[in-house]
C-alpha cells in the first residue's frame, strides 16, 4: 500500500486508463527537462525473483518495472524507505540517468517535495551492473532503460 491507499477493489471497477495515459504523457514530456544525474529507489521487505539476479540468454541481469517507478535524488530518503520494515530485507537501487533514459522531476508539484522525487514511466528496464552492501542494505547499481515506445496523449489521439 502506498500512502495508505487500499488494494484494487477500492477502485470500484475503474482502472483509470485515461489517467494512467495522461500521467505517462507528462513523464515522457517532462523527462526531457530532467538533469541526467544519479537517483535512488528504496525497497523494504521485497524479494526479487531469481531471474532478476541470473543472466539471461543474452547475458543480461535485471527486470522490467511494470508500474510507474518512483525514485529520489536523495540517497537518505531511499535508505529510509529501504529500512522501513525492521527485520525484512532492505534494498536500494542506485541508477545513473543518461541522455535518453531519464525520469520526470516531480518536486515542483509534489505533496512531499522534501523527497525530491523523479518518476519513471511504466515498463522501465533495470539492468543489474553490480552490487555492494552498505550496513544492512543491499545496494544494487542498475542501468535504467525507459520505454521508448511510450507515447504522449497528442500522439495517441
Positions of the model-derived regions?
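Internal glycine-rich, Lys/Arg-flanked active-site/core loops of soluble domains
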Residues: 1-100, 104, 108
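Active-site and NAD+-binding cores of ADP-ribose-processing enzymes
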Residues: 44, 72-75, 79-156
Amino acid at each position: 500500500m502506498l500512502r495508505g491507499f487500499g488494494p484494487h477493489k477500492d477502485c470500484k471497477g475503474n482502472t483509470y486508463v485515461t489517467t494512467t495515459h495522461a500521467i505517462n504523457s507528462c513523464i515522457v514530456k517532462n523527462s526531457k527537462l530532467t538533469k541526467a544525474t544519479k537517483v535512488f529507489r528504496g525497497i523494504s521487505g521485497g524479494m526479487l525473483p531469481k531471474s532478476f539476479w541470473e543472466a539471461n540468454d543474452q547475458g543480461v541481469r535485471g527486470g522490467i518495472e511494470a508500474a510507474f517507478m518512483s525514485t529520489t535524488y536523495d540517497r537518505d530518503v531511499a535508505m529510509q524507505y529501504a529500512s522501513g520494515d525492521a527485520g525484512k530485507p532492505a534494498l536500494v537501487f542506485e541508477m545513473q540517468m543518461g541522455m535518453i533514459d531519464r525520469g520526470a522531476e516531480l518536486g515542483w508539484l509534489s505533496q512531499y517535495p522534501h523527497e525530491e522525487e523523479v518518476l519513471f514511466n511504466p515498463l522501465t528496464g533495470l539492468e543489474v551492473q553490480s552490487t555492494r552492501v552498505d550496513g544492512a542494505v543491499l545496494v544494487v547499481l542498475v542501468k535504467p532503460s525507459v520505454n521508448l515506445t511510450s507515447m504522449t496523449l497528442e500522439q495517441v489521439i
